[in-house]
């Protein structure tokens, strides 16, 4: 028996697969889920979501969202989700640099500071997952 992992973004269902384990970046720290885990729900930070299938790890960059565990099913409702091999590193690097430059021009009191900070975290997660 295995866990069912579903990753969904506003645009599409990204993945539906049977897995042995899921590790995700929660807002209160990283955590793992295995078979028969207690039900819970948490918010996700931008970062690396890893699942293990048949002893092999697979990595996704998620741009925040929510994760729910119930009845051996893990549902990820992510703002964005990209498999490591699908990440355009040049585009991610440019997005990171652009967001970082915009953030440096803002103070924490600026209305757009929080949004730019989130853009930096999402782009950094994509670069990390892509291995760059």
UniProtKB/Swiss-Prot annotation:
Q: Which Pfam families match?
A: ATP-synt_DE, ATP-synt_DE_N
CC annotations in GO: plasma membrane; proton-transporting ATP synthase complex
A single Gene Ontology MF term assigned here is: ATP binding
Which keywords, in A-to-Z order, does the entry hold?
Answer: ATP synthesis, Cell inner membrane, Cell membrane, CF(1), Hydrogen ion transport, Ion transport, Membrane, Transport
Topology in the lipid bilayer is annotated as:
Peripheral membrane protein
Q: Which CDD domains match?
A: F1-ATPase_delta
User: Which compartments does it reside in?
Assistant: Cell inner membrane
> What NCBIfam families does its record include?
ATP_synt_epsi, PRK13446.1
Q: What does this protein do?
A: Produces ATP from ADP in the presence of a proton gradient across the membrane.
Q: Which family does it belong to?
A: Belongs to the ATPase epsilon chain family.
Q: How does it assemble?
A: F-type ATPases have 2 components, CF(1) - the catalytic core - and CF(0) - the membrane proton channel. CF(1) has five subunits: alpha(3), beta(3), gamma(1), delta(1), epsilon(1). CF(0) has three main subunits: a, b and c.
- PANTHER family from the UniProt entry: ATP SYNTHASE DELTA/EPSILON CHAIN, ATP SYNTHASE EPSILON CHAIN, CHLOROPLASTIC
In Swiss-Prot or TrEMBL terms, this protein is called ATP synthase epsilon chain
Record the organism.
Anaeromyxobacter sp. (strain K)
Q: Which gene encodes it?
A: atpC
């Amino acid at each position: 028996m295995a866990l069912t992992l579903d990753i969904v973004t506003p645009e599409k269902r990204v993945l539906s697969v049977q897995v042995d384990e899921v590790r995700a970046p929660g807002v209160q720290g990283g955590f793992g889920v295995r078979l028969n885990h207690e039900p819970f729900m948490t918010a996700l930070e931008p970062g690396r979501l890893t699942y293990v299938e048949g002893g092999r790890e697979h990595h996704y960059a998620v741009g925040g969202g929510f994760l729910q565990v119930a009845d051996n099913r893990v549902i990820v409702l992510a703002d964005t989700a990209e498999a490591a091999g699908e990440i355009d590193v040049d585009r991610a690097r440019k997005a990171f640099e652009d967001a970082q430059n915009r953030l440096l021009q803002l103070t924490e009191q600026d209305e757009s500071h929080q949004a730019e900070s989130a853009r930096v975290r999402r782009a950094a997660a994509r670069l990390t997952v892509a291995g760059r």
